[in-house]
């Protein structure tokens, strides 16, 4: 799959519909957008730079390294290109997925060393991104800061030396979808798909 070639079998389309809750018409729209944006460099699929350009409007408060890490998480076959299924799945996780799925991905994104725990520097990065995104969305700075600190506080960690594990992070942040919205993982408005 890739630029100009997002033809999926009926079974693959049905699988995407079931997995993502997108309709057939939405899958068709995503296919058109994928073909348009992924063909800029004449390579097959979404490259890292095309991914960053495409998602910059949503993640303008994220630094480039974090966007590269996000790309790598979605590039499940590790070939440096997002094929159409990976692209649709990435949009689903960022917009329509249940809060727990979004939080699981966010944990993996910020657990840069893949230790299974968010250490101090990783938590600081998470807090910085959440505060920047939240305030750019019009949320009160002190309210955003206090909320994020309450999620990442030592009270929510069973092993304060190692840091917060994935289960603890999800439990602390999943009381509502507020944290996901703050970090720009929110369902799009109206008819927009991303």
Curated annotation (Swiss-Prot):
* Sequence ranges assigned to domain EF-hand in this UniProt record: 62-97, 98-133
- Signal sequence span is none
From which domain of life does this come?
Eukaryota
For biological process, the GO terms are: calcium-mediated signaling; regulation of signal transduction
- InterPro entries on file: CNBL1-10 (IPR045198), EF-hand-dom_pair (IPR011992), EF_Hand_1_Ca_BS (IPR018247), EF_hand_dom (IPR002048)
PROSITE patterns in the record:
EF_HAND_1 (PS00018), EF_HAND_2 (PS50222)
What residues does Ca(2+) 1 bind to?
75, 77, 79, 86
Entry keywords, A to Z: Calcium, Metal-binding, Repeat
Q: Which residues bind Ca(2+) 2?
A: 111, 113, 115, 117, 122
Answer yes or no on keyword Cytoplasm: no
What does the record give under GO molecular function?
Answer: calcium ion binding; kinase binding
The family classification in the record reads: Belongs to the recoverin family.
Please state what the protein is called: Calcium-binding protein J
Q: Which organism is it from?
A: Dictyostelium discoideum (Social amoeba)
- From the UniProt record, report the name of the gene that encodes this protein: cbpJ
């Amino acid at each position: 799959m890739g630029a100009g070639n997002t033809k999926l079998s009926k079974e693959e389309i049905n699988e995407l519909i079931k997995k993502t809750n997108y309709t057939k018409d939405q899958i068709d729209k995503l296919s058109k957008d994928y073909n348009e944006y992924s063909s800029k460099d004449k390579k097959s699929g979404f490259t890292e730079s095309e991914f960053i350009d495409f998602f910059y409007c949503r993640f303008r408060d994220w630094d480039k390294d974090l966007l590269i890490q996000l790309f790598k998480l979605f590039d499940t076959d590790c070939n440096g290109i997002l094929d159409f299924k990976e692209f649709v799945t990435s949009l689903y996780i960022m917009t329509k997925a249940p809060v727990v799925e979004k939080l699981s991905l966010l944990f993996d994104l910020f657990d840069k060393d893949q230790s299974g725990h968010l250490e101090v520097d990783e938590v600081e990065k998470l807090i910085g991104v959440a505060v920047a995104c939240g305030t750019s969305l019009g949320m009160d700075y002190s309210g955003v800061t206090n909320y994020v600190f309450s999620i990442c506080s030592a009270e929510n960690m069973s092993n304060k030396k190692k840091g917060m594990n994935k289960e603890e992070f999800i439990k602390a942040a999943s009381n509502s979808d507020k944290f996901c919205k703050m970090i720009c993982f929110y369902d799009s408005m109206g008819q927009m798909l991303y």
